[in-house]
């Protein structure tokens, strides 16, 4: 009653400040639209009489209500149905208490205050709508820092000493997750300024309405202290359908004077909800099905599910101009609602009612070529010393021959790798390697390959000046695929290796074996086979790349660092270069 008397005094003091209507009328006289002037002029006459006319009568609802609307909802001004709740406003605390008491009596529910406004400094931010206040063309400021939130007695448990004891007991007894009731009551107190109302007719140009809104805000900022205004309490009350996971109480008073039949639209919604939902829910059936789909795909985080639901509602269910407001809990569920639904779907997955769908991957988790985040995979190859110091070392890293097409045997080996790097393994049917190294007589500079599992072949004699204690790097494959040799034994490229046995005659052309700084030394090979001399056990990291312009998009590896022994006497004459292999074709 005290607040009601204060509100009456505020409203009755407004006629004293007669300068406010004059300022508003003069400011709006220059406007091209005349409707703002008429709305302001209609408020000038009653102010001189000294009676309170700013309190609005019981207005018609924003949308027609059905016959089964509860009596407590009919007491709200401008009442509208939002999901399983009804929202309207009251103009006094007495009216608000009356509606809340009537609602509790008819629903037989007990509520606890979860959140209450704090006595902070008065708000000065002008708004046209908010999460709790719909748009009606009247600007307002919040009269409290926060809204009043009341939860059902079967709602979520809150932090406290008793909660710690209960959580310890449940952890010891391996108690399962218990879903809680999501029903809530929201109360928001605001201060409206009907003197600065703008039209809400959809036929009026939006640009004109925006200009009027800017004018109203400008005048309100200048006269906010003397503007007065009307206090309103916007209330959102849930129905019995909003209560879940507990037995409903038997109402002592009937919800309506007579049992009216349900409308066809409501009956259809009820049938769809019963058929598609795992359990009774206030969520829209398509939203509940989306949660089930996300959880079955492995998305179980609450906020990740909420983000996907918002995108689903705003982009798929509705057009941009028809998206419901965020306070419609049927399409924008709370965190508690999402937790409950995730838990129900997880239980269904365990019992086998819902099958886990691992084939469908969400679009946000799929790697595409436009994402730019290319995964780099590292393979470490260790070159170890042989049994004899004077024998070369053969390291086997794959067999890639200069063929026009890939043989069918390596395809099963490449298929699992293609799932990790789709950009690299897109052209498996056109395996072609272009050699960069060439001998002076036009033949290719080749690297010797030992295709047999023996790790100690006879020593190589290249150009007659290779010493016996040098270790040559031979690229090969531990599993010989049985493909034919690249070049005949009597070819020009095999002539420098006449002393090699037949087991070492398999030759492989290497694409970009030597870096840019080593290209000049490539011409000094004089038909000799390129060799890399290694010491005792060097580890070479190999990275998979796909940004090089001359990259062969098969199984390609890159040697970033190759160490050489500085003590070898023949390094300065035969193997002086550092190998920086951008691409080495390996299977």
From Swiss-Prot:
A single cellular component GO annotation: nucleus
Entry keyword Nucleus: yes
Keywords, comma-separated and alphabetical: Activator, DNA-binding, Nucleus, Transcription, Transcription regulation
GO molecular function: DNA binding; DNA-binding transcription activator activity, RNA polymerase II-specific; DNA-binding transcription factor activity, RNA polymerase II-specific; RNA polymerase II cis-regulatory region sequence-specific DNA binding
Chain residue ranges for the region called Disordered: 1-23, 437-466, 479-499
Gene Ontology BP annotations: cellular response to calcium ion; positive regulation of transcription by RNA polymerase II; regulation of transcription by RNA polymerase II
Intracellular or extracellular location(s): Nucleus
InterPro entries xrefs: CaRF
Sequence ranges of Polar residues compositional bias: 1-10, 437-452
Entry-linked PANTHER family: CALCIUM-RESPONSIVE TRANSCRIPTION FACTOR
Role played: Acts as a transcriptional activator that mediates the calcium- and neuron-selective induction of BDNF exon III transcription. Binds to the consensus calcium-response element CaRE1 5'-CTATTTCGAG-3' sequence.
Domain topic, free-text comment: The N-terminus is necessary for DNA-binding. The C-terminus is necessary for transcriptional activation.
Name the record gives this protein: Calcium-responsive transcription factor
Source species of the chain: Rattus norvegicus (Rat)
Lineage of the species this protein comes from: Eukaryota, Metazoa, Chordata, Craniata, Vertebrata
